[in-house]
Amino acid sequence: MRTLWIVAVWLMGVEGHLYQFENMIYQKTGKFAIIAYSNYGCYCGWGGKGKPQDATDRCCFVHDCCYGRVNGCDPKMGTYSYSFQNGDIVCGGDDPCLRAVCECDRVAANCFAENLKTYNKKYWLSSIIDCKEESEKC
């Protein structure tokens, strides 16, 4: 189901902040998120359950938790303000909700970059059915 959703979004043309998040990830890792992170482990992609499989999957778990704490807007819609300054992502703008979404995305993109060396292709295209352990709390 999560793969179908990701493909549907990709085919529609990614709008708003999902495109921005993709760009952040590419700038920090050199990887295209839709390919590398849309169906990785138990948490990267649509939904999530179980125990994160590795450090990269934990980045997605933390990102999901961060989105869960955002109030006042839909974390997957809208457009936020950000820039790259000296290799760092800097979130801006006046809307506190969109700024919070940007911060969630910034932290995740940095986390992916910090864990590039441990990215394991065996978790790419893994099935969420394999994520049977009890989910952690945020």
From Swiss-Prot:
Species of provenance: Echis coloratus (Carpet viper)
One Gene Ontology term, aspect cellular component: extracellular region
Residue numbers binding Ca(2+): Y43, G45, G47, D64
Keywords of this entry: Calcium, Disulfide bond, Hydrolase, Lipid degradation, Lipid metabolism, Metal-binding, Secreted, Signal
InterPro entries the UniProt entry points to: PLipase_A2 (IPR001211), PLipase_A2_Asp_AS (IPR033112), PLipase_A2_dom (IPR016090), PLipase_A2_dom_sf (IPR036444), PLipase_A2_His_AS (IPR033113)
UniProt-annotated catalytic positions: H63, D105
EC number: 3.1.1.4
Chief location category: secreted
Function (record text): PA2 catalyzes the calcium-dependent hydrolysis of the 2-acyl groups in 3-sn-phosphoglycerides.
UniProt-recorded name of the protein: Phospholipase A2 EC3
Cofactor(s) essential for the protein: Ca(2+)
Record family assignment: Belongs to the phospholipase A2 family. Group II subfamily.
Location in or out of the cell: Secreted
